[in-house]
Curated annotation (Swiss-Prot):
Protein name: Mating-type M-specific polypeptide Mi
Function as written in the Swiss-Prot or TrEMBL entry: Mating type proteins are sequence specific DNA-binding proteins that act as master switches in yeast differentiation by controlling gene expression in a cell type-specific fashion. Required for meiosis, but plays no role in conjugation.
Annotated gene: mat1-Mi
Species whose genome carries this gene: Schizosaccharomyces pombe (strain 972 / ATCC 24843) (Fission yeast)
Cellular localization per UniProt: Cytoplasm; Nucleus
Note: There are three genetic loci for mating type genes in S.pombe, mat1, mat2-P and mat3-M. Cell type is determined by the alternate allele present in mat1, either P (plus) in a h+ or M (minus) in a h- cell. Mat2-P and mat3-M serve as donor of information that is transposed to mat1 during a switch of mating type.
Keyword flag Iron-sulfur: no
A GO CC annotation given for this chain: Pi Mi complex
Main location: cytoplasm
Taxonomy, superkingdom: Eukaryota
Length: 42
């Protein structure tokens, strides 16, 4: 394992974390929108 390999792995891990974070944020927003629609219907 060279330093370049470790650096590449670090970048990939960061990208995966960002993708996971954006997925979580998007799903949270969708849940909030669904709740708003339900409360508006009542």
């Amino acid at each position: 394992m060279s330093a370049e390999d470790l650096f590449t792995i670090q970048i990939l891990c960061d990208q995966i974390e960002l993708k996971l974070a954006s997925i979580v944020i998007n799903s949270n927003i969708k849940l909030q929108l669904k709740r708003k629609k339900k409360t508006q219907q009542l």
